């Protein structure tokens, strides 16, 4: 038994719905080494220049004089950890999960979703198509890295990155199998068709895990950041929500993880219970109304837009 075969022994204990290493597809075949395919994707991502640029990107709050506020790098690490916890409990491919989690926000821009909205507006004005950060993450990895040659990741990893959507929560996540050509068509359609990104479904169960973990990672953490900046108080959280999923980031993360695991074991899809899913939706709505809509002043947004416009 060679080293790679030893590393792949864990696949014997995989769920029948997990993605096996031999199922990895690349646009350009590569020479094998001791590392499993999706493990190599992790290495290629963390050694990319795009990954290095995570370092100073902000999450929700920008230009704040507080070192304890979450940055984009922290967020992707949290997504990776949460997703791997769920993946391990469900006996899925943790390498694919980690690769997708670490790469999912590579295309995010300064000033978070506000920056994304501004760039979308500018991009359309210049006839460059719709701008979505998940699509730009794939573009970084396929078309920009390595002097425009890309770093040749597995299609399953790229698809999970393309299909992540922290803005859209679902009670159930059913993977949608697709060919390489269908993935490439999805990628192209995101530039051409308004709202197309909202229709995307990951082609693996691992991709679905990363998608829901993105939401789990930011909900409670953003509340903590807002409390540090005195934007909200813990008592502001509605009791109808906290009674179900908790009031601290630790409680929220644990409740959501355990609910997904308990409702998804031995299933070909992910599922949340009715009451937890409703609480998640209400908490997300609370965050939008009390945190995200107040994270930037009108003056700051105007300044951001002027900066982007001058650089475009």
State the predicted function of each range.
Residues 103-111, 217:
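Short active-site segment of divalent metal-dependent hydrolases/proteases
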Residues 1-73, 78-86, 93-94, 115, ...:
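Histidine-centered, transition-metal-coordinating active-site segments
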Residues 46, 91, 107-110:
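Short coil/turn residues that cap or connect secondary-structure elements
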Residues 112-125:
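A glycine- and small-aliphatic-rich helix-loop capping segment at beta-alpha/alpha-beta transitions
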Residues 99-100:
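Active-site alpha-helix of zinc metalloproteases
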């Amino acid at each position: 038994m060679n080293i790679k075969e030893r590393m792949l022994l864990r696949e014997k204990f995989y769920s029948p719905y997990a993605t096996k290493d031999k199922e990895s597809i690349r646009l350009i075949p590569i020479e094998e080494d001791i590392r499993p395919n999706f493990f190599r994707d992790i290495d290629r991502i963390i050694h990319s220049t795009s990954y290095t640029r995570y370092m100073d990107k902000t999450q929700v709050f920008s230009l704040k004089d507080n070192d304890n506020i979450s940055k984009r790098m922290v967020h992707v690490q949290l997504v990776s950890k949460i997703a791997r916890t769920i993946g391990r409990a469900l006996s899925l491919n943790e390498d694919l999960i980690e690769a997708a989690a670490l790469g999912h926000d590579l295309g995010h821009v300064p000033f978070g979703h506000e920056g994304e909205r501004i760039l979308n507006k500018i991009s359309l004005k210049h006839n460059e198509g719709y701008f979505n950060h998940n699509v730009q993450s794939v573009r970084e990895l396929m078309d920009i890295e390595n002097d425009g040659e890309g770093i040749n990741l597995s299609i399953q990893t790229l698809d999970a990155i393309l299909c992540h959507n922290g803005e859209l929560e679902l009670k159930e996540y059913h993977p949608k199998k697709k060919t390489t050509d269908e993935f490439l068509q999805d990628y192209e359609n995101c530039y051409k068709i308004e709202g197309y990104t909202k229709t995307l479904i990951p082609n693996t169960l691992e991709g679905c895990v990363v998608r829901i973990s993105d939401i789990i990672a930011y909900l409670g953490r953003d509340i903590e950041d807002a409390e540090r900046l005195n934007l909200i108080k813990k008592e502001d959280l509605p009791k109808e929500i906290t009674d179900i999923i908790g009031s601290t980031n630790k409680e929220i993360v644990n409740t959501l993880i355990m609910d997904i695991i308990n409702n998804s074991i031995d299933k070909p899809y992910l599922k949340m219970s009715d009451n937890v899913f409703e609480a998640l939706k209400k908490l997300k709505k609370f965050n939008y109304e009390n945190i995200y809509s107040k994270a930037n002043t009108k003056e700051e947004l105007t300044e951001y837009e002027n900066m982007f416009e001058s650089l475009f």
